[in-house]
């Protein structure tokens, strides 16, 4: 919808403060660049020739071609036919095409999809450098939470078309509270002993879930459990992963 490819069934779309209607749609899109999954190219043409087609259609200066090829580190491969490009090079060429007009808003859909670890790292570094170098806003859509964790500073999570979370990445991590998971030879007795000491706990999948304790309090509780003749089978510090938080927010359970 942001790119004008799909019309909303209700309401309206505003991009860069302007409505995406018939009067301003093209003016808005001139300030937007996009890379949607795996872009298509003319394989018999070189990378530079492919970009020249886009440059002509967009009406931007020809010098932008050389500049964006340098930005995505393809200036040394500009005379090579795209049919002989690796997948990572093709993705970078797609990013170069999206950057040709130096947009205010850059939309990237699964930009690291199908890349090997080296290609993922290179694409990630390129994407992260763009806001500071060119003052543009970059929106990345990805199902790889680890990639978002390393690239984004603001996050939005959508469930079946509904926005269920929108805030800073730091705020999302804030939902991942550290806690202790305790398993003893008798959790029921241990739970009563902990509550006598005003330590909140709840049972979950065979473990007692406790807040993080000071060293002094942890030592005190260890002595208390020993006095009640309770053996500690396992005590570990846990933290919810981004995947756990995502599944909680979307209400989805993992499935094969």
Predicted region positions:
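ABC transporter nucleotide-binding domain
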Residues: 124-212
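Short amphipathic alpha-helical interaction patches enriched in hydrophobic/aromatic residues
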Residues: 36-40, 176, 229
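Short, charged/small-residue-rich alpha-helical element at the C-terminal edge
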Residues: 178-249, 256
């Amino acid at each position: 919808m942001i790119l004008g490819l799909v019309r909303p069934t209700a309401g309206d779309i505003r991009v860069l403060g302007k409505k995406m209607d018939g009067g301003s749609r093209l003016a808005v899109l001139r300030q937007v660049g996009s890379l949607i999954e795996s872009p298509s190219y003319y394989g018999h043409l070189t990378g530079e020739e492919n970009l020249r087609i886009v440059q002509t259609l967009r009406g931007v200066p020809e010098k932008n071609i050389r500049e964006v090829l340098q930005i995505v580190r393809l200036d040394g491969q500009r005379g090579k036919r795209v049919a002989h490009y690796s997948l990572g090079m093709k993705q970078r060429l797609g990013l170069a095409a999206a950057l040709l007009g130096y947009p205010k808003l850059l939309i990237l859909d699964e930009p690291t999809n199908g890349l090997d670890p080296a290609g993922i790292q290179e694409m990630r570094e390129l994407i992260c450098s763009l806001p500071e170098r060119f003052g543009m806003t970059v929106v990345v859509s990805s199902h790889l939470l680890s990639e978002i964790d390393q690239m984004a500073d603001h996050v939005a999570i959508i469930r079946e078309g509904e926005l269920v979370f929108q805030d800073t990445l730091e705020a999302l991590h804030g939902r991942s509270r550290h806690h202790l998971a305790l398993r003893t030879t008798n959790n029921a007795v241990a739970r009563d002993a902990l509550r006598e000491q005003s330590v909140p706990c709840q049972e979950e999948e065979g473990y007692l879930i406790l807040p993080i304790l000071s060293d002094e309090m942890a030592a005190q509780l260890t002595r208390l459990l020993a006095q009640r003749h309770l053996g500690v089978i396992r005590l570990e510090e846990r933290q919810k992963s981004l995947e756990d938080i995502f599944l909680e927010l979307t209400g989805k359970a993992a499935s094969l």
